[in-house]
């Protein structure tokens, strides 16, 4: 026999309890429909998404084709280039080395990469630029790895776009200058993360890719993740990629090597492997595997905003806004976004037609993971072929912003009150 609740608060709690799972399920179903609609609207050839909540089974759904010419559908094995989300792995590697006593974040970068002494710094000594400033994009280095770009396909015949060797980057350092007083403001720099990759290699004695595999991918069980070109047994699952300009769809080079820029944009992985990464980021603090990869206190340090992640005079875009015009701060390799007093952590990625997002709700133990294989330039003119560029058009800004806002405003709140399996034990 049912008894009457002893108070209104009890009645509300019971009602919430009955609603938690159905309400959350309804929100993810509505999000799935919105996801399909947004990708169709932007002419995306193929993509995938996963939602992770605690240690519950991930919700995954897939859209369109991995390869348009053969109509090979996207599935759980499809591998994407995660582009600048790689920077979060690089930041974790630097923090690992710090926690192991190999470096301090306030060490001068030139101590580990002496070639930087050739850079022109009109604001002081190059010795004043720290590893911390490289992590927070506040060291004053330019964005692209090369100091120039090609403006059309005709002028790009000297590609591949990205340098393949450190010696090519080092040769440009005497012609590189610091653009502003280091530490004074934020300016996104792919080049800075190339230098961080060099620090990891020189301290560990391993190639960057080998270090990340040993210290992050393998411990987390990310067995289908890799750098550079796909190993033979995974080639069939590599997604093609495209630039779209109106009705014109331009295929991008397939299975490309990101060269010396691998530490800022080289990670390739399927959605399920990125689910494993997301579980690490939102995981149970009591699970010993997380301290093996990175102490939770160090991860929280990375998720602490250091300075506004906005260029002077910059208009809001996918990197610099959230719901209600909220503006992010830059942490150590991660962006930190406060929306109505609630903290979200994220990073985007764009390269060679691929576009991606990793969005984390630490307090709610939830994460959203997005990857698509098409960059919608929003331009009516033919798309420029930029095979491996980090400076191609600001890709899929509206798409990512829409997905991010849907998660923050609707999906994450629906799951925030739903206990994880670990919490119910």
What residue spans do the PLM features occupy?
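Short, gly/Ser/Thr-rich active-site loops of penicillin-recognizing serine hydrolases
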Residues: 306-319, 370, 375-425
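Short, glycine/proline-biased beta-turn/loop segments that scaffold the active-site neighborhood
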Residues: 105-121, 218-220
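Short, conserved catalytic-motif segment at the N-terminal edge
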Residues: 28-80, 102, 118-119, 174-175, ...
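Glycine-rich phosphate/pyrophosphate-binding beta-alpha loops
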Residues: 259-268, 343-378
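Active-site SXXK
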Residues: 35, 49, 55, 79-106, ...
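Short, surface-exposed loop or secondary-structure junction motifs
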Residues: 65-67, 121-350
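Bacterial N-terminal signal peptides
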Residues: 10-20
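Bacterial N-terminal signal peptides that target proteins for export
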Residues: 1-12
